[in-house]
Amino acid sequence: MNFFVPARALKDKEWQPLLAGNPHIKLYIYNTTPIEGFQSFCNWIFRKGWGVPRPHNVLIPSIAMGLRLPFRKIYLAGADHSWLPEITVTDDNVVLMHQKHFYDQNKSQADTVKQENLNSARLYTVLYHMYVAFKSYFILEAYARKLGKEVINVTPGSYIDAFKRMKL
């Protein structure tokens, strides 16, 4: 089994002994340094494994790592990213987001969106972070094309419009 771990996780020694003695698990460390700039420069950095498009969520580095593997096609399933209808703003200007996940859809509730300083985030900040994530998919699509590879989104109703769509 191959186990991909971001380099920053190496600081936490707690999980490492669990894997160290298992000969069936191969550990791959990847760099999540956000890379921006001219596409050709970014492609060179991505190929070297020195960084990824701004990794706003786990899917972005996952696709980047997949493109470094010997597969010609990568299929995305369960990547709906349909966050926009989940956002509301209260009459007190508090931004709420109902983040549903497959493992807690019946229990999740709308909650205040917090910034790193734990203050309530403004709507423009939330939308900007979404912009960054969606833009990263277009950067990955261009990189995939340059490699002669293809990322295919098989998620019905997905908001990710950067990749070719296909129904299963």
Stretch-by-stretch model annotation:
Residues 1-168:
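Metal-ion/cofactor- or nucleotide/acyl-coenzyme-handling active-site neighborhoods
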